[in-house]
């Protein structure tokens, strides 16, 4: 199932928080919206699944207009927002069974589907316990299971691993990979570089509500930065700038020092950096943080 958005804008008062976003989610694809907090990811996310009305623009899921044919669209979409919104008065199993009722899935069919999802999520042992006994990671897996109760074709995940510890994040990533293998399309918002790079087939980079670039993660890194960068501290900016400009490469201040892209023929530049009286010098693979820093001048953590 395809999703297309054309020229989405959202104003709050006179302030435009999303400006002209156009995207295409292809069948079976994971499309990531990557940007810092405040970039407009969640607002864009809301407009795409119908939770936020755009000031201008069109969102189409298959043959349906998201904001005019909401009933048909809701049967196709599964949504995981940043809030868990689980019912604390119900058990883990009951949360799934009663949520299934929203989609007219009842009786034995609802029970069977709930148990199937609990098994897929590794939550069978918790079926008859209340949700407040679950860890943060288990709650997120339950929320994802709940979003799948009606066999959606497209699943929306808004910052799905925020607040989770590293082990819980890894476990949730495996759930998303399984979801893709089942044939679902996934739209993911995140401000975690590693999450975006690992999960997404394609990325849209958002800054202040504007798409600043897009493409496959590896292609973005290779095209905008190159294979490697150097990080250096303890030298004057003028020295780094002079060396980078002489080599025709990108550089920026980063933390207490500077980051400099290393071209494929980097031996002279790397040797020149090594010759400087720096307090720290290292080289590493380029990543999406570098891409975002070059495109916007801002770190993803900002």
Question: Whereabouts are the PLM-identified features?
Answer:
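ABC transporter nucleotide-binding domain
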Residues: 173-263
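Conserved catalytic motifs of ABC-family nucleotide-binding domains
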Residues: 151
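Conserved ABC transporter NBD signature motif
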Residues: 57-68, 72-73
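Conserved ABC ATPase signature
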Residues: 130-137
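Catalytic Walker B motif of ABC-type/P-loop ATPase nucleotide-binding domains
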Residues: 155-158
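Conserved ABC ATPase "signature" region
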Residues: 97, 101, 108-126
């Amino acid at each position: 199932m395809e999703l297309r958005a054309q020229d989405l804008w959202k104003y709050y008062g006179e302030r435009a928080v999303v400006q002209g976003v156009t995207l295409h989610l292809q069948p079976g694809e994971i499309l990531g919206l990557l940007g810092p907090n405040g970039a407009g990811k969640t607002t864009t996310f809301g407009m795409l699944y119908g939770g936020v009305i755009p000031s201008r623009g069109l969102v189409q899921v298959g043959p349906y207009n998201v904001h005019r044919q909401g009933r048909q669209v809701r049967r196709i979409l599964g949504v995981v927002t940043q809030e868990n919104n689980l019912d604390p008065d119900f058990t883990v199993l009951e949360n799934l069974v009663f949520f299934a009722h929203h989609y007219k899935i009842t009786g034995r069919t609802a029970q069977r589907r709930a148990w199937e999802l609990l098994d897929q999520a590794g939550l069978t042992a918790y079926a008859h316990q209340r949700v407040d006994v679950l860890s943060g990671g288990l709650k997120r897996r339950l929320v994802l299971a709940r979003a799948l109760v009606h066999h959606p074709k497209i699943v929306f995940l808004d910052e799905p691993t925020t607040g989770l510890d590293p082990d819980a994040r890894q476990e949730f990533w495996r759930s998303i990979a399984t979801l893709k293998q089942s044939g679902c399309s996934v739209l993911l918002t995140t401000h975690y570089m590693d999450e975006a790079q690992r999960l997404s087939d394609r990325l849209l980079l958002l800054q202040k509500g504007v798409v600043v670039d897009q493409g496959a993660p590896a292609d973005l890194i290779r095209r905008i930065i190159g294979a490697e960068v150097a990080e250096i501290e303890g030298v004057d900016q003028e020295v780094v700038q002079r060396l980078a400009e002489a080599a025709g490469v990108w550089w920026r201040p980063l933390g207490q020092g500077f980051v400099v892209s290393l071209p494929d023929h980097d031996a002279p530049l790397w040797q020149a950096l090594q010759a400087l009286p720096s307090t720290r010098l290292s080289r590493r693979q380029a990543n999406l943080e570098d891409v975002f820093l070059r495109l916007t001048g801002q770190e993803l953590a900002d």
